[in-house]
Amino acid sequence: MSVAITSNNNKQPQPQPQPHLKVVNNNSTFNLYTWLRSVFQYCISLIISYTSNWLLVNNDNNNNNININYKSNNNDNNNASTSLQPKISNVKAESMKIFPDLQKSNFTTYYTTEKPLHQDVLKPVICSTGITSRILPYTNEKGELEWKFTEVQGKELDEFKMHPQQQQQQQEVKQELSPAESNESNESLAKDSSTTPASISDSPSHSETESTVSSTIIANSNQIFKCPSCDAEFRVRGYLTRHMKKHSTKKAYTCPFHDKSIYVDENNITHKCHSSGGFSRRDTYKTHLKSRHFNYAKPIKSAERSKVPGQCAMCGEHFNSAEIWCEIHVEGGECKFLPMGFKGKSRIKNRLKKQIQKNKMIDPELVPFASKVLEEVEQERQKKKNYRTTGTGSESSIQSQESESSINSTPLSMQISAPVPMPVSIQQQHQHQHQHHHHVQNQHQQHVNQQQSIATPASIYSSSASSTSSYESTHSPYTPQSSRSPLSHMYNPQQPPYFNQIAQAHQQDGQKNQVKDDYDDEYCLDVDQLNTTFVNETVANYLQIHDFHSMNQYQPGQQQQQQQQQQQQQQQRQHQQQQPSMYF
């Protein structure tokens, strides 16, 4: 390495020295500074590489040691927490990094099984919020303090308690049972009695309440129900109601052949199918019909009668079984010897009708009887059709009659709307027309009154004023005609001519004003007076009377005006005649 090297005249750039090798050129001179610098860089690079490798190896060893210790400590459940804490703290102190490695999380989730529910949780607890309810503390078996509702005996509810006399009356009412009541067991009564406030115990525990309820049920189960008509006794209330139907005079079922089955033999002994012919139950009624009024082909036991054919004892018709005979022939009302108006309750026949109406499959046993039921169904359909056709026709005829009667009965003033009041200038222009109209109306009214009297508004006004003065003395003068006595509607008396009616109405204005002055509020109307027809009638009558007054008032003024006009016309004519004579 200690060799002298000469350089050429043309100098070239020297390459950078590498850390591991030293390049020596023949043309370069020896430089100590560059050599030392390269050696120093090479040493530093070696130191850095060795230290990095050493650190990586130590980290891997530490991680393996931590995992081994963690697994061993998990097996020991009691010493797990104490053994892990110091080791982990030492590892953290030795290998602290600025950027830690991504590893498994230090948080672990422990799943614990759910505890089973206690049996006492499923039991109901008495809870009350009434007047006498109290919430009191008590200590349980574990010594813990708990709170529960209890009923404390007090005098708050004494006002609502029943006296002994009322309790006896209530018990007597309960014992009086009607035959129509349904069968109810004694257990339901025990349940009702157990739910009363008196049966709830004052203790907070649930076992004591169960014992009290069971004791009340046992006490009520020993109760006996006696029949008031005989000495029969029953433990179930429903049996008593069924028994009491025997003592009732009116039975639910009666034998239809009872009257025809009575006969007297040679020894003057009367024979009947039954003592009274009445039955309180359907099953006993049907057994009576099958045993007394159905003839079997051969003598047979009562248990085997349902499948044996036979004949009707009254009409002799043959049937495959007594059940079909009873349901269709007797209850269906097909036997000829049934009394008039007999209505049975045939369940089989009703089922057949429903099957035929809904077009369903018919039972093969009931096919022979389906023809009769089909005829009845068709008859019912025809009746419904006839009723609909006649009903629509009758309704239309009734509506037409009502419309005609309403047209004939309506007054003349109601067919035309009520006149509207006009100013005085327009009235003066149409006075002549009003006079002509009233004159024609007067002649027409006289002609109509000879044939029949029509209830015009003016006639109603005058008739009410003349014939019901006594009624108005006790009632309001504004009451309409419809609210008066119904006897006034039974006849329609003849009325005087139209103008005479108006004159009579004006003569009686003084009497009406005296009655109206007795009332403070003249505008107080009844409910019946709010009807539109009554308002139209009153307005029309008022306007007609007003027109008549205006005509009578303006007649003298019109006569004077006509006389003045005639005088002026005569003066003008005379003046015209005098003018040509002056020119001549």
From Swiss-Prot:
GO terms for cellular component: cytoplasm; nucleus; plasma membrane. Residues 203-214, 394-407, 442-480 have a biased composition (Low complexity). It comes from the Eukaryota. One of its GO terms (biological process) is amino acid import. Disruption phenotype: Exhibits reduced capacity to take up amino acids and to switch to the hyphal form, and impairs response to farnesol. Keywords: Cell membrane, DNA-binding, Membrane, Metal-binding, Nucleus, Repeat, Virulence, Zinc, Zinc-finger, Zymogen. SMART domains: ZnF_C2H2 (SM00355). Proteolytically cleaved: activated by the amino acid-induced proteolytic removal of an N-terminal inhibitory domain. InterPro entries: Transcr_Reg_ZincFinger (IPR051643), Znf_C2H2_sf (IPR036236), Znf_C2H2_type (IPR013087). Its main location: membrane. It is found in: Cell membrane; Nucleus. A zinc finger (C2H2-type) spans 225-247. The keyword Endoplasmic reticulum does not apply. Transcription factor involved in the regulation of gene expression in response to extracellular amino acid levels. Synthesized as latent cytoplasmic precursor, which, upon a signal initiated by the plasma membrane SPS amino acid sensor system (including CSY1 and CSH3), becomes proteolytically activated and relocates to the nucleus, where it induces the expression of SPS-sensor-regulated genes. Required for efficient alkalinization through the release of ammonia from the cells produced during the breakdown of amino acids, and subsequent switch to the hyphal form. This is Transcriptional regulator STP2. It comes from Candida albicans (strain SC5314 / ATCC MYA-2876).
